[in-house]
Design a protein with these regions (language model features):
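N-terminal amphipathic/hydrophobic targeting modules at extreme N-termini
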Residues: 2, 17-22, 26-31, 37-38
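Extreme N-terminal basic, low-complexity initiation segments
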Residues: 2-12
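Short hydrophobic targeting helices and cationic amphipathic motifs
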Residues: 9, 30-31, 41-42
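Short, Lys/Arg-enriched N-terminal segments with co-localized hydrophobic residues
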Residues: 38-52
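Anion-binding (especially nucleotide phosphate/pyrophosphate-binding) glycine-rich loop
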Residues: 54-195
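Phosphate/pyrophosphate- and phosphate-bearing ligand-binding catalytic cores of soluble enzymes
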Residues: 56-57, 62-66, 108, 199-358, ...
Length: 386
C-alpha cells in the first residue's frame, strides 16, 4: 500500500514540477530530485514528442525551400498544435541545437547541410473572430488567407496577393508589396517561448515592425515558435492603385474602379508575369530589400540618372528599387556558374540547376559590390541566409 501511495504522490509531484517549469518557476533544463520515505526520485524535464508529429533524422530540406537547394538537417520536427509545439521545445536537448524555425521556405537560402534541428509548423487553420478580425495558424498558406479575406469582403490584404509562404512568416518578415505591409494588418501574434514552453501573446507594437523587419527577425530570432497570427481587416474598401504598374495594368483591361476581386487578379497576373515559378526555376522571390536613402542622396543620383524610379517615404527619405540598380549594373539575365539573375526581374536571383547555397551567396556578394561601386549604396538580402 505504501508503494502505491508513494507512486501516486510521485505522479502528483511530477505534475507540480512540470507546471512550475512551464510557468517559469523552475529551470526547464535542470533535473529535480525528490526524497520520499528516504528514497531519491529523479524527475527529468524531458518529454517525448507526440506520436502523431513528424520527427525525422537526416532529413532532406529540398521540399521545404523554394530555391531548390538539396541540403539536409540533422533532425526535422513538424508540430500541428500549440500543445505539440510546447512538447517539442520541452523535449529539446543540448545536442538538438542549433535551431532553425522554418515556414514555407520561400524566403530562405540554405548555404549547406544544417547541423541542428529544423522546426516546422503544421498548424493550419483560419478562423473568423468577428469584428473584421481573422486568426490563422502559423502554417496556413498566406495567399489562402488573402483569398479568404477578399471572398468575405474583408479588405486591406488584396495588394499582398500571391506572396508565397505561410502566415507565421508574415509576422517575422513583415512581408509587403504594392504599397501594403503585413504590419498594417497584424493585431496579435501568439507564440511558444522555446526556453520555457510558455504561450505568449504579442501586440503589434511589441513586435517593433519596420520595412521587412521585426523583433522576431532579430532580438527574438529562434526564441519563439509562432503558432498563430490575428489580423484586423476592414469592411471599408479603399483600393491602393498608385504603386508599381497597377493603374497601367487596370487601364489595359478597361477598369477604372476595380473591385477587390479584380485588383487581386491584376496583382496576381503582374507578379506571375515578372516572377519565376519556383516549381520550374528555383528562387525566393525578391532577394534584396529596396534601400531607403536620404533625400540628398536621392537628389544626387537623380541628377546623374534621368528618370530614376523612386518612392517617397517621408520628407527626408526616398526608396530606390534595388532591381533597377542591379539592372543598371548589367546583371539582368546574367549568371555566375549555376546561379543567375532572372531575365524578367533583376531583383530575383535564381537557381539555374544544381546551384549550391554558396553559389547564390557568391552571386549576391558580387552584385552587392557592383551596386556599391556604381551608386554608393549598400543593398542587403531580404532572404534569410542560413
Amino acid at each position: 500500500m505504501a508503494f502505491r501511495e508513494d507512486k501516486c504522490l510521485l505522479i502528483v509531484i511530477e505534475s507540480i514540477v512540470w507546471v512550475m517549469k512551464v510557468c517559469g518557476k523552475a529551470n526547464p533544463h535542470h533535473p529535480i530530485f525528490i526524497n520520499i520515505r528516504g528514497n531519491n526520485h529523479f524527475i527529468p524535464f524531458t518529454h517525448k514528442v507526440s506520436s502523431d508529429m513528424k520527427d525525422l533524422k537526416s532529413y532532406s530540406l529540398l521540399p521545404h525551400n523554394t530555391f531548390g537547394i538539396d541540403a539536409k538537417c540533422r533532425r526535422f520536427v513538424e508540430y500541428n498544435t500549440v500543445e505539440e509545439a510546447q512538447d517539442v521545445v520541452r523535449s529539446l536537448k543540448d545536442d538538438d541545437y542549433p535551431l532553425l524555425i522554418l515556414g514555407g521556405g520561400s524566403n530562405l537560402l540554405l548555404t549547406g547541410d544544417y547541423a541542428g534541428t529544423v522546426l516546422h509548423s503544421g498548424i493550419s487553420f483560419i478562423e473568423d473572430l468577428g469584428n473584421e478580425r481573422v486568426r490563422c495558424g502559423s502554417g496556413y498558406v498566406w495567399d489562402d488567407f488573402v483569398d479568404y479575406c477578399v471572398r468575405h469582403n474583408l479588405y486591406g490584404a488584396e495588394n499582398l496577393s500571391i506572396i508565397p509562404g505561410e502566415c507565421g512568416a508574415s509576422a517575422v518578415q513583415n512581408i509587403g508589396a504594392y504599397g501594403a505591409e503585413a504590419k498594417d494588418l497584424i493585431e496579435e501574434v501568439e507564440a511558444v517561448e522555446i526556453a520555457t514552453g510558455k504561450v505568449c501573446h504579442f501586440a503589434n507594437a511589441d513586435c517593433e515592425y519596420s520595412y521587412r523587419q521585426s523583433k522576431f527577425k532579430h532580438e527574438w530570432r529562434d526564441k519563439f515558435l509562432i503558432t498563430s497570427v490575428t489580423y484586423k481587416l476592414s469592411k471599408t474598401y479603399e483600393p491602393r492603385l498608385d504603386y508599381g504598374n497597377i493603374r497601367a495594368a487596370l487601364a489595359e483591361r478597361g477598369i477604372d474602379n476595380p473591385t477587390a476581386t479584380e485588383l487581386r487578379q491584376v496583382i496576381t497576373d503582374i507578379r506571375n508575369a515578372k516572377l519565376p515559378d519556383p516549381k520550374r526555376i528555383g528562387n525566393a522571390g525578391s532577394f534584396f530589400m529596396n534601400p531607403i536613402v536620404s533625400k540628398d542622396k536621392y537628389l544626387e543620383l537623380a541628377a546623374q540618372y534621368e528618370g530614376m524610379p523612386h518612392y517617397t517615404i517621408d520628407d527626408d527619405h526616398e526608396k530606390i528599387p534595388a532591381g533597377w540598380m542591379i539592372d543598371q549594373c548589367g546583371w539582368r539575365g546574367k549568371a555566375l556558374g549555376n546561379a543567375g539573375v532572372y531575365e524578367k526581374q533583376a531583383l530575383v536571383l535564381v537557381n539555374l540547376g544544381g546551384a549550391t547555397g554558396s553559389d547564390v551567396v557568391h552571386l549576391c556578394e558580387t552584385i552587392q559590390h557592383d551596386v556599391k561601386e556604381k551608386f554608393g549604396i549598400e543593398i542587403h538580402p531580404e532572404v534569410n541566409v542560413r
